[in-house]
């Protein structure tokens, strides 16, 4: 299902009602004292995280939300009724920014999390509050305060545990198809993936994790080349990055070690924090190498890559197209995720201004 992951909206909480300036006028009490009640508070606006919502598309069509004004106070000490609050339901993973300052107002990271994003104005005071020993018939009252008014930018960042990195045509979409229920487009040409994809990987009946596939990076991506760099924001909440490398490229001029090193370089240039996440090397397309040559090809690559990058993390040779080697990878990911704490959400890159579409497929 396609969904919008960014929207801009205007919100205005309700103004407070005005206080009343009235006096008791009862039989036999023609000069009664003040009895003007206070105005009601304006309705506030809240954002609530809802795991049953997967998109911000509703906020593309309805962009203005204005809270109800509090009612004015009345005579006989009648206080005005408060304005009704507005509840805006958003997907879990939505980050709410002040559009003008880019300050993060709220980060909806858990289901049913509720955050006030615009406070309703206080009701004005009735003249009953201004009575004193020297002023027994006050005509003073105050008007209600204005409700808060904001322009907001909503950004949905997918909540995936594992993210896939690599050049176009490295086999990322093939891998996510092989081990999850996601069904991204797969073809034998680069740039097949044009939008991020999510897939739920079932380890067993009780364990699963979410994997995100984004369009491939190319050299020069940090300077704007290709599609992948604009989608990297969707990997910021992942806990493990899988760097897929085509170990058997068809192009004789291709150098897998050089290409893999280039991807890491682009990642560091664009987002050093993302580059510092645990990153595992996955050597794909083992099926294209004769069986008797596979072990040597893997050893030679690892030796050259470690020399070029000082990499000392785990390495998983696989053939995504037929599933070879994917089970050890899945179990290793599951075990590592169990030992890791959930990432702190809030320290996010605020420079992404593009609006994207994501394809989410789960079981």
UniProtKB/Swiss-Prot annotation:
Q: Which family does it belong to?
A: Belongs to the TRAFAC class OBG-HflX-like GTPase superfamily. OBG GTPase family.
Q: Which organism is it from?
A: Dechloromonas aromatica (strain RCB)
Please indicate which superkingdom the organism of origin belongs to.
Bacteria
Cellular compartments annotated: Cytoplasm
Q: Where is the Obg domain?
A: 1-159
Query: Which residues take part in binding Mg(2+)?
Result: 173, 193
OBG-type G domain residues are 160-338
Biased-composition ranges for Acidic residues? 346-356
Which parts of the sequence bind GTP?
166-173, 191-195, 213-216, 284-287, 319-321
| UniProt xrefs under Pfam families | GTP1_OBG (PF01018), MMR_HSR1 (PF01926)
The protein's gene is named obg
GO biological processes: ribosome biogenesis
Q: What does this protein do?
A: An essential GTPase which binds GTP, GDP and possibly (p)ppGpp with moderate affinity, with high nucleotide exchange rates and a fairly low GTP hydrolysis rate. Plays a role in control of the cell cycle, stress response, ribosome biogenesis and in those bacteria that undergo differentiation, in morphogenesis control.
User: How does this chain assemble?
Assistant: Monomer.
Please give the name of this protein: GTPase Obg
Disordered as annotated region, ranges: 342-363
Record's GO cellular component, any one? cytoplasm
Cite the entry's keywords alphabetically. Cytoplasm, GTP-binding, Hydrolase, Magnesium, Metal-binding, Nucleotide-binding
> Record's InterPro entries?
G_OBG, GTP-bd, GTP-bd_Obg/CgtA, GTP1-OBG_CS, GTP1_OBG_dom, GTP1_OBG_dom_sf, OBG_GTPase, P-loop_NTPase
Q: What is its EC number?
A: 3.6.5.-
Q: What is its main location?
A: cytoplasm
A molecular function (GO) term: GTP binding
Cofactor(s) listed in the protein's UniProt record: Mg(2+)
């Amino acid at each position: 299902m396609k969904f919008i992951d960014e929207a801009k909206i205007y919100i205005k909480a309700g103004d407070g009602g005005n206080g009343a300036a009235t006096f008791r006028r009862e039989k036999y009490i023609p000069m009664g004292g003040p009895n003007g009640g206070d105005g009601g508070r304006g309705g506030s606006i809240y954002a609530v995280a809802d795991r049953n919502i997967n998109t911000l598309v509703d906020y593309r069509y309805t962009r203005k939300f204005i809270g109800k004004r509090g009612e004015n106070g009345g005579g006989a000490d009648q206080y005005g009724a408060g304005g009704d609050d507005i509840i805006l339901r958003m997907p879990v993973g939505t980050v709410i920014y002040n559009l003008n300052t880019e300050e993060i107002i709220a980060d909806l990271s858990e289901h049913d999390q509720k955050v006030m994003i615009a406070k309703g104005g206080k009701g004005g005071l009735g003249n009953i509050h201004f009575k004193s020993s020297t002023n027994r018939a006050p005509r003073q009252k105050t008007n209600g305060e204005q409700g808060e008014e904001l322009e907001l930018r909503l950004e949905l960042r997918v909540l995936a545990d594992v993210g896939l990195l690599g050049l176009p045509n490295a086999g990322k979409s093939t891998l996510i198809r092989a081990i999850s229920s996601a069904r991204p487009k797969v073809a034998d040409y680069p740039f097949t993936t044009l939008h991020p994809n999510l897939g739920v990987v079932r380890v067993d009946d009780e364990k699963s994790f979410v994997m995100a596939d984004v369009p491939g990076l190319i050299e020069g991506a940090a300077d704007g080349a290709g599609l992948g760099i604009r989608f990297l924001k969707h990997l910021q909440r992942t806990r493990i990055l899988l760097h897929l490398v085509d170990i058997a490229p068809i192009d004789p001029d291709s150098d897998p070690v050089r290409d893999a090193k280039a991807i890491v370089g682009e990642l560091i240039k664009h987002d050093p924090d993302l580059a510092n996440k645990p990153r595992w090397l996955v050597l794909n397309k083992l099926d294209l190498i004769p069986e008797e040559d596979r072990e040597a090809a893997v050893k030679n690559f690892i030796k050259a890559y470690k020399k070029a990058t000082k990499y000392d993390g785990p390495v998983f040779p696989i053939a995504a197209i037929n599933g070879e080697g994917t089970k050890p990878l899945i179990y290793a990911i599951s075990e590592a995720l169990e030992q890791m704490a959930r990432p702190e959400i809030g320290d996010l890159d605020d420079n992404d201004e593009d609006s994207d579409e994501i394809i989410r497929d789960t079981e």
